[in-house]
């Protein structure tokens, strides 16, 4: 029997998580464990908690919320505390409310759950559902249908990537899906805003917010294809070295030392 570990960054109460769990339990004869944050941890990136203790709070059978833990905490602690004799065959992080594309991957708690898994040697996928502001509620039907196929593919054929690599998968907004595209991550144009306010005691505070979801115009990027109605699958590697720049930096350093 296969074993699956599930986490997310929208908290243990999120709709995307609940529907993912329901589908996996129905479609796969697998032992499923869920460890999710107790509260929403969107944009927490790959942070782990080192300054205070964490505890599992049981929600249901093999279902735990991690008290004030991040997605990376959830995966790390699950692998080291809950799995005694055998590690999971797959870690799934999601389904996130909102896309995780381009450099937003570096901010994403959803992607961080998958990152922590592959750092620990476990194959992983990150799932995110794009939606438009006009949509009153998210429709996960297409996401669940395609996730089922991807998980089945992994179990039948093995994981397609190497060590410290995961699949970042984004599903388009509610519409007829045009297909699936394997593509690169886009390039984000960042224009964050900081909104200033004064609290009742006269102290200034700020709310951070992204003004617009703007990206560079690249036809073959995840965001461009996602907006056109395609499911995007981007292989992500954790090796951040810019190998093609090493000679340049070596020459630069040598020139500065002469």
For every predicted segment, state its role.
Residues 99-108:
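Glycine/threonine-rich flexible loop motifs
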Residues 159-162, 166-258:
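C-terminal accessory domains and tails appended to enzymatic cores
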Residues 6-13, 104-105:
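Short, glycine-rich nucleotide/cofactor-binding loops
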Residues 125-153:
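Short, glycine-/small-residue-rich phosphate/pyrophosphate-handling segment
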Residues 4, 20-81, 86-87:
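A cross-family phosphate/adenosyl-ligand binding-site feature
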Residues 113-118:
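Hydrophobic/aromatic ligand-binding patch that stacks against planar heteroaromatic rings
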């Amino acid at each position: 029997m296969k074993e699956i570990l599930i986490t997310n960054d929208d908290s243990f109460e999120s709709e995307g998580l609940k529907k993912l769990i329901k589908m996996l339990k129905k479609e796969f004869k697998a032992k499923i464990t869920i460890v999710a944050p107790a509260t929403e941890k969107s944009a927490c990136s790959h942070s782990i908690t080192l300054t205070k203790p964490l505890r599992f709070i049981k929600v249901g059978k093999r279902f735990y919320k991690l008290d004030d833990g991040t997605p990376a905490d959830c995966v790390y602690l699950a692998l080291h505390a809950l799995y005694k004799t055998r590690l999971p065959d797959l870690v799934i992080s999601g389904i996130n409310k909102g896309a995780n594309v381009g450099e937003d991957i570096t901010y994403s708690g959803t992607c961080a759950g998958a990152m922590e898994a592959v750092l620990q040697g476990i194959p992983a996928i990150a799932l995110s559902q794009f939606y438009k502001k006009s949509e009153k509620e998210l429709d996960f039907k297409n996401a669940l249908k395609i996730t089922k196929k991807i998980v089945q593919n992994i179990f039948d054929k093995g994981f397609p990537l190497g060590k410290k690599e995961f699949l970042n998968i984004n599903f388009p907004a509610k519409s007829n899906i045009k297909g699936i595209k394997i593509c690169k991550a886009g390039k984000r144009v960042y224009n964050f805003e900081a909104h200033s306010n004064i609290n009742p005691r006269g102290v200034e505070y700020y709310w951070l917010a992204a003004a617009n979801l703007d990206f560079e115009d690249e036809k073959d990027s995840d965001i461009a294809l996602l907006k056109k109605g395609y499911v995007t699958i981007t292989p992500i590697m954790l090796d951040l070295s810019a190998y093609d720049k090493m000679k340049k930096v070596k020459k630069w350093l040598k020139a500065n030392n002469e």
